[in-house]
Swiss-Prot record:
GO MF: acyltransferase activity; identical protein binding; malate dehydrogenase (decarboxylating) (NADP+) activity; malolactic enzyme activity; manganese ion binding; NAD binding; oxaloacetate decarboxylase activity
Listed GO CC annotations: cytosol
Listed SUPFAM superfamilies: Aminoacid dehydrogenase-like, N-terminal domain, Isocitrate/Isopropylmalate dehydrogenase-like, NAD(P)-binding Rossmann-fold domains
UniProt source species: Escherichia coli (strain K12)
Enzyme Commission number: 1.1.1.40
Annotated protein name in UniProt: NADP-dependent malic enzyme
């Protein structure tokens, strides 16, 4: 580690507060009553319920989502036996990964005890606190004994990740690698370097999946492990001892091997050894930080080799974070009493299958131009693939139920998977009613920026989720090339339609219709033709206008107002509406907040504000939310008389005339809108109850500033929109920062609007 990296790491761990984890309350502690419920006397009620039924601890405490990361520091991350205290940063780091990838809370526990039996006593006594135990960085062979004894004694999952995590990922990689090179697991021969926890666990899993034990040769620091080599050989090693044929070294046994599994140390495998391996060999060089052989050296002599390492700077990284958070997620969610072989094998299969799926946009963004299509350079998923939790946790949970170790079986896996999806996509719960409605009758949605990677990823999701019938505008050869490069599985003409923006035979009809719309706005026939060629949003808008598409989503490239100008000119406003407006949703930990008008009207008058407010309330109801509207101003219920506050008061009167049932009040300050106590202090008889969820601003400047401040200041908040309101057709204009999920969300909303506004 160079000095700069070392200092950066030390600063990272020291500032702004020491360490990487903290405990945060999940219940409010704002009043005396809150304290009485959280502690004495109210806390006695759940205590007595748990005394009567211990399983209620999962209902009334955090136990069901709490894992202990426990170590004695005897084998810390390549640092060796540095002791329990020195290993604490690693254990905190493990806790951060649990939380980041699976939402699991962790207490890291460093036990200063080298005696395995005493260590077992300490850990076993902690069972009432935790839903699961993750053993970490405990040296072999003690780790085998400790895990075995704890599993026998405890009725919660005990999982030594150094063994099983590496084994699960390695096994998934081997299954996929064999598929790539078309070899059968029952026929291949494997040579293993290292006989520690990970190597033994990996061999056990592979044997369970069909690898023949007599086709495995293991080498440790003393050479080949053969029967009779030493009288007191550890039982775990002895299980893989081969009949003595006189071969003593790795070089002696590597010839003809299909698989090399390295769990040992750097530079153990040489180029000469690699040359002697079988056709299309698999090399898993997992020693860290320097593997048994560097991939470029192996590829130099065997271009046909498939290579995995534990490093992120080479393809096919075997990284335990691919499995341990999600195995525990599935185990905790069914109240598993153990993580058994069936659950591990379920994880292996789920991980292996995910590598065959289309590429995730999140992964594509993280890994740049890497080709992440299934093949020699991509046989296991990347650690940041957001689908890992959705695939692995349900597979593990099902295996726990089928193998009889689940105490709280899941009744509806569709609901469970939806809940897991909420962890991946924070908008999932919010969008659920929209998605459900869209699936009932998917509509044709045209996407003018059809060559964009985000749009292509969104198209894949739309097809997979059954939300829409996408129509992409773009050059077919470019779209096909990018689909292949992105590793997507959608097919033009099957999953979506392409409109060639260079040569569609309908273009004369399109520009003629556009000219008819624009001819009295200074647009000539020649300009109409040029607009169609240069601006795919014009093509999309005309398609919707002609009934060849039901809705349109544009704006992922270019200026919002240029796109909106096309939309406004082609479609105009809905009947009875004299303006349009844009609204953004912020999904914050404190609740959902909608802000209008964020993009369309610079200085709306009272009439326009009233229309925007009514459209905002209508839109919010689509999400299954009852609107509560606050009209905001620097004035608080008449405290200041100026044009801005006056128009907000006028808008309130207009809204109340047109929608007397709507819960609305104003004009008011922002704090009064969000905190009922502040509002009631100023206006005790306010018709607005609770916290407002729609904030209507006096102008676009205030709306955009408020929206961006809230968006950036809330690290846990996510956004939906902008939602375009008031246009005669189901159309939304996004912005260039729109993510794939935002595109998907807005397409689904447009579909629902098209269902209720038939063309």
């Amino acid at each position: 580690m160079d000095d700069q990296l070392k200092q950066s790491a030390l600063d990272f761990h020291e500032f702004p507060v020491p360490g990487k984890i903290q405990v945060s309350p999940t219940k409010p502690l704002a009043t005396q009553r809150d304290l009485a419920l959280a502690y004495s006397p109210g806390v006695a009620a759940p205590c007595l319920e748990i005394e009567k039924d211990p399983l209620k601890a999962y209902k009334y405490t955090a136990r069901g989502n709490l894992v202990a990361v426990i170590s004695n520091g005897t084998a810390v991350l390549g640092l060796g036996n540095i002791g329990a205290l020195a290993g604490k940063p690693v254990m905190e780091g493990k806790g951060v990964l649990f939380k980041k990838f699976a939402g699991i809370d962790v207490f890291d526990i460093e036990v200063d005890e080298l005696d395995p039996d005493k260590f077992i006593e300490v850990v076993a006594a902690l069972e009432p606190t935790f839903g699961g135990i993750n053993l970490e960085d405990i040296k072999a062979p003690e780790c085998f004994y400790i895990e075995q004894k704890l599993r026998e004694r405890m009725n919660i999952p005990v999982f030594h990740d150094d063994q099983h995590g590496t084994a699960i990922i390695s096994t998934a990689a081997i299954l996929n690698g064999l598929r790539v090179v078309e070899k059968n697991i029952s026929d291949v021969r494997m040579v293993v370097s290292g006989a520690g926890a990970a190597a033994i666990a990996c061999m056990n899993l592979l044997v369970a999946l069909g690898l023949q034990k007599h086709n495995i040769v293991v080498c440790d620091s003393k050479g080949v492990i053969y029967q009779g080599r030493e009288p007191n050989m550890a039982e775990t090693k002895a299980a893989y001892a081969v009949v003595d044929d006189g071969k003593r070294t790795l070089d002696d046994v590597i010839e003809g091997a299909d698989i090399f599994l390295g769990c040992s140390g750097p530079k153990v495998l040489t180029q000469e050894m690699v040359k002697k391996m079988a056709r299309a060999p698999m090399i898993l060089a997992l020693a860290n930080p320097e593997p048994e052989i560097l991939p470029p050296l192996a590829k130099e002599v065997r271009p046909d080799a498939i290579i995995c390492t534990g490093r992120s700077d080479y393809p096919n990284q075997v990284n335990n974070v691919l499995c341990f958070p999600f195995i525990f997620r599935g185990a905790l969610d069914v109240g598993a009493t153990a993580i058994n072989e069936e659950m591990k094998l379920a994880a292996v299969r789920a991980i292996a299958e995910l590598a065959h799926a289309e590429q995730s946009e999140v992964v594509a963004s993280a890994y740049g131009d890497q080709d992440l299509s299934f093949g020699p350079e991509y046989i296991i998923p990347k650690p940041f693939d957001p689908r890992l939790i959705v695939k692995i946790a349900p597979a593990v949970a099902k295996a726990a139920m089928e193998s009889g170790v689940a105490t709280r079986p899941i009744a509806d896996f569709d609901v469970y998977i939806d809940k897991l999806t909420e962890f991946v996509y924070k908008t999932n719960l919010f969008m659920k009613p929209i998605f459900s409605q869209a699936r009932k009758a998917p509509k044709r949605v045209v996407l003018p920026e059809g060559e964009e990677a985000r749009v292509l990823h969104a198209t894949q999701e739309l097809v997979t989720l059954g939300l829409a019938k996408p129509i992409l505008i773009g050059r077919p050869n470019v779209i096909e090339m990018r689909i292949q490069k992105l590793g997507l599985q959608i097919k033009a003409g099957v999953d979506f339609e392409i409109v060639n923006n260079e040569s569609d035979p309908r273009f004369k009809e399109y520009w003629t219709e556009y000219f008819q719309i624009m001819k009295r706005r200074g647009v000539t026939q020649e300009q109409a033709q040029r607009a169609l060629i240069s601006n795919p949003t014009v093509i999309g808008a005309i398609m919707v206008q002609r009934g060849e598409a039901d809705a349109m989503i544009c704006g992922t490239v270019g200026d919002y107002h240029e796109h909106f100008s096309v939309v406004k000119n082609v479609f105009g406003y809905r009947d009875g509406v004299h303006t349009a407006g844009a609204m953004n949703a912020l999904l914050l930990p404190s609740g959902n907040t909608f802000i209008a008008d964020t993009y369309v009207n610079d200085e709306p008058d009272a009439e326009e504000l009233a229309e925007i407010t009514l459209m905002a309330a209508e839109t919010v109801r689509r999400f299954g939310i009852e609107p509560r509207v606050a009209l905001l101003s620097h004035s608080n219920f008449g405290s200041s008389d100026c044009p801005s506050s006056s128009k907000m008061r006028q808008a309130l009167e207009l809204v109340r005339e047109r929608a007397p049932e709507l819960m609305i009040d104003g004009e008011m300050h922002g704090d009064a809108a969000l905190v009922e106590a502040i509002r009631n202090d100023r206006m005790p008889d306010s018709s607005l109850k609770g916290s407002a969820n729609i904030l209507v601003m006096p102008n676009m400047e205030a709306a955009r500033i408020s929206y961006n401040l809230l968006r950036v200041s809330s690290s846990e908040g996510v956004t939906v929109g902008p939602v375009l309101m008031g246009v005669a057709k189901p159309v939304h204009v996004l912005t260039p920062i729109a993510s794939v999920r935002r595109i998907v969300n807005m397409v689904a909303l447009a579909v629902v609007e098209a269902q209720t506004q038939p063309l």
